[in-house]
Design a protein with these regions (language model features):
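Catalytic glycan-binding domains that act on GlcNAc-containing polysaccharides
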Residues: 1-152
Length: 152
């Protein structure tokens, strides 16, 4: 996610106001930290340690979210497009297909489609480089649900 969001640039800032390595919106960071990031406090989101901590917490939150349920494809879509948009897309698209690749291509947001494809590709490239198994790639290739499992 970090590679796609900021290309490892700690000072990255989006036009929408997302900040830091994980490109966290201040409202999302505040929800994860249970404190607000307003005004000058928003600049704390450029601190790599805090940004990674909150970004990792948000990824874990999304993986457990009822709309995602451990599905790494849905997690990436929710990270970029938001859980609310993902819920709408799921209701609309899953009526037509359960194939994960068709789901990606059917999402109405080009930005989210591209994000999901790049994040998953990067995830599998890193897993391959470290000699790790890629059950989520195998699942998607077989048209099945790609459930994330930590290797730690």
């Amino acid at each position: 996610v970090m590679r796609q969001e900021s290309a490892f640039n700690t000072r990255a800032k989006s036009h929408a106001g997302a900040r830091g390595l994980m490109q966290l919106m201040p409202s999302t960071a505040g929800y994860m930290a249970r404190k607000r990031f307003r005004g000058g406090r928003r600049n704390k989101l450029y601190e790599p340690g805090l940004n990674l901590q909150l970004g990792q917490k948000y990824l874990g939150y999304l993986l457990q979210h009822e709309t995602v349920n451990g599905n790494i494809l849905m997690m990436a879509a929710a990270y970029n497009g938001g859980p609310g948009n993902l819920a709408k897309w799921r209701r609309r698209i899953l009526k037509l297909t359960s194939d994960p690749l068709l789901f990606i291509e059917s999402m109405p947001s080009r930005e989210t489609r591209d994000f999901v494809e790049r994040v998953l590709s990067n995830f599998w490239i890193y897993r391959d480089r470290f000699g790790q198994k890629m059950p989520t790639l195998d699942a998607i290739a077989a048209g099945k649900t790609p459930i994330y499992k930590s290797i730690d």
